[in-house]
Amino acid sequence: MVVDLDKYLKPGKDHYLALGLEGSANKLGVGVIKHNKGPLSSTNRAEVLSNIRDTYITPPGEGFLPRDTARHHRNWVVRIIKQALATAKIAGKDIDVICFTQGPGMGAPLQSVVIAARTLAQLWNIPIVGVNHCVGHIEMGREITGAENPVVLYVSGGNTQVIAYSKQRYRIFGETLDIAIGNCLDRFARTLKIPNEPAPGYNIEQMAKKGKHLVPLPYTVKGMDLSMSGILAAIDSIAKEMFGKQQKKLIDEESGEPITAEDLCFSLQETLFSMLVEITERALAHVDSNQVLIVGGVGSNQRLQEMMKLMIQDRKNGQIYATDERFCIDNGIMIAHAGLLSYRTGQTNQLNNTVCTQRFRTDEVFVKWRDD
């Protein structure tokens, strides 16, 4: 089946423009993307005209509450939209469709962004499209890297899933049974009072590079799924013994050297990433694929990419794909891109069907724009 992506091209135009708004967590992103007519390919790539982002950052040891995050988004959304349009050198009347994150995510921040999206759609009298946050990550990753039909490892603050495409759905082959990997890293960063700027997970990554002693932690893989709450509880307990009132010194049995905070970050990363590599490799075998695409904020972690690369090298013609922080970390351009793909196949939302949802499964989305 060949999908017609130009059925809804406006008369006299040879391209499409979409504005995307992302605000499912603490990052507010607005992006403008351009698709030329015809199917996207290696010779007809989507063009990123602007990709502006602002992050709500809290003090060390604190997370971000939905109410405060939503206030940040409301305060900044108009300025970010204006900046995105100015960077793209276009006006509102040039936009074909408004795209917004419909879920999953934090309720209050999502609601702040959808209000802005509805306002723009009515102000400029153009269609509006709700986008699944995960599908946005996948489609942007595929477009930027050129990955054809990879197994997708989606790792972020709110999601951890192993995904593969089949029959116009992104099927979930494995996922976390409790907390997401980004949540696990962020919460441990709060335990250690690690700064939240530019991001707690990034700061843990930098500390882990200085670690060299592996502290034993639970390793919880259950078939294709994994659990991280027990690992977090275990390493939190160790950290509180070391840096709390007890000031207990832990010694590495092999070297006789003291365990440091850097060693804890190193141990947490190595354990979590080993679990992710295991279930991803199992999915590759199941669908007979040799490509892995890593998306989501944690996907920019260099150690995760390195470990995945070591695994994929053992497979014939194995390839790993990942983007940099511009596209791995939550952004508006991925929402614009996925939303524009929906728009080009005639999928739009009526205003009364733009309600956000905190629970929005990846496999709920009908991927109409891909050939079956």
UniProtKB/Swiss-Prot annotation:
GO terms for molecular function: chromatin DNA binding; metal ion binding; N(6)-L-threonylcarbamoyladenine synthase activity; nucleotidase activity. The keyword Nucleotidyltransferase does not apply. One of its GO terms (cellular component) is chromatin. A divalent metal cation binds at residues 133, 137, 154, 330. It is an enzyme of class 2 (transferase). It is found in: Cytoplasm; Nucleus. Its EC number is 2.3.1.234. It catalyses: L-threonylcarbamoyladenylate + adenosine(37) in tRNA = N(6)-L-threonylcarbamoyladenosine(37) in tRNA + AMP + H(+). PROSITE patterns: GLYCOPROTEASE. Component of the EKC/KEOPS complex composed of at least BUD32, CGI121, GON7, KAE1 and PCC1; the whole complex dimerizes. Belongs to the KAE1 / TsaD family. Component of the EKC/KEOPS complex that is required for the formation of a threonylcarbamoyl group on adenosine at position 37 (t(6)A37) in tRNAs that read codons beginning with adenine. The complex is probably involved in the transfer of the threonylcarbamoyl moiety of threonylcarbamoyl-AMP (TC-AMP) to the N6 group of A37. KAE1 likely plays a direct catalytic role in this reaction, but requires other protein(s) of the complex to fulfill this activity. The EKC/KEOPS complex also promotes both telomere uncapping and telomere elongation. This is tRNA N6-adenosine threonylcarbamoyltransferase.
